[in-house]
Amino acid sequence: MKKELLESILNALPYEIVFCDRNHTIQYLNKTAKQHYGERIHIGDSIFNCHNQESKKKIMNFLEKADAGSDEMFEAYNPIKQEREFFTPVRNSNGKVIGYFERHEVH
């Protein structure tokens, strides 16, 4: 699949996609994420720069569960924004978790 096509698909999604590698470094932001976060986060930043200690623990726990075989996991519901947050592991062709993204579904 061509990179441009894949990027177009990700940019068409109505929710933010922020992909991080196993070191929790932001490697990709789709168009919606760039619009939402603006200058607050950038590719190359640690995802923990925009998360508190409680969120950091959750992310570490989700990554551990993903390594054990879990797929997308519900993270939280934000009643103020009326959105559900999910943690989604990304695996390579051998099934090894190479990173993750958090996505937000607006209701």
Enumerate the predicted regions with their spans:
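Sensory/regulatory domains in signal-transduction proteins
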Residues: T32-H107
